[in-house]
Amino acid sequence: MNMIDFEYDGIKLSSLKMSISSFSDPDDEQELGNNLELVNVKGQFADSYFSAGYSYTEPYQLEFYTTKYNCDNYDDFVISDAELNTLIRWLNRKSYCKFKPIYNDGSFADVYYMAYFNMSLLKAGGDIVGLRLTLNCNAPFGYQETKVFNGTLGSSPLTIEDVSDEIGHLYCKTTITVKSAGNLTIQNSADKYNAVIIKNCKENEIITMSGDTKIITTSMDSHKKLPNDFNFNYIRLVNTFSSRTNTFTANLPCEIKMEYNPIRKVGLVI
């Protein structure tokens, strides 16, 4: 499995007649990222430590090379000024854009990273023949393309298997269409102490919430006190090392749509 191409902000490297190149030993070890650092605490009279927390030491970063590849003319390997300008404008942005690796065996086709590039030039005989690219990600890991789940709660549960590589919880973007007025409670079997409670719901009211942004909205102007009626427990998916199952139930009939991006710790293989 090797990365032979990539897509950045919807444009493929190969569409610009460039290819991924390697100037290192093909058996070199490559980092996967995901480097953790535990916060260790030891009692005054104890000999062993226990973990009181953790943090990732740095976002994921990878360096690789790209050179020109023109299958119509193998002697056309020099990058012109115009081609260089196009590459710089495309890759060297002031914001994180979607980066998708493309592997020769089709592996991890639904995995992406949010990243920007730094670059330096490779010269031979005074000509620019390649670029050294440094991929800088916004996190120590990648993401899987958005997964969407739909269900009708109240009459039947909605069961979701959290496929994230990260043990813990991930918030979802959730849209709830309430079919009967009342005080709504949504419970997750894997998150028993984080029940979602929204009081004074109206019939056919559409409530949208995002745990990442901590924003909740309603389709009805008459529910002006929604922030006061909400307990600020946002819907999330939970997984442990032994279980990934999340079963959602509700006390009122409602349609629910949940969207999330699982964390993937697969790294990049050049």
Feature locations, PLM:
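A short, compositionally biased
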Residues: M1-M3, L91-C97, K179-A181
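Polar/acidic, low-complexity leader/linker segments enriched in S/T/G and N/D
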Residues: M1-N40
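Short amphipathic beta-strand/extended segments with alternating polar/hydrophobic composition
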Residues: L13-S19, A109-Y116, N194-C201
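Oligomerization/assembly interface segments of phage tail-like spikes and tubes
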Residues: V41, D47-F77, D127-F141, N246
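Solvent-exposed loop and beta-edge segments used for protein-protein assembly and interaction
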Residues: Y54-Y60, L91-R93, G125-V129, E166-L170, ...
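Long, hydrophobic/aromatic-enriched structural stretches that serve as scaffold segments
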Residues: E58-N104
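Short beta-strand and beta-hairpin "edge-sheet" elements
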Residues: Y96-P140
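Intrinsically disordered, low-complexity segments enriched in serine, threonine, and glycine
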Residues: Y143-I270
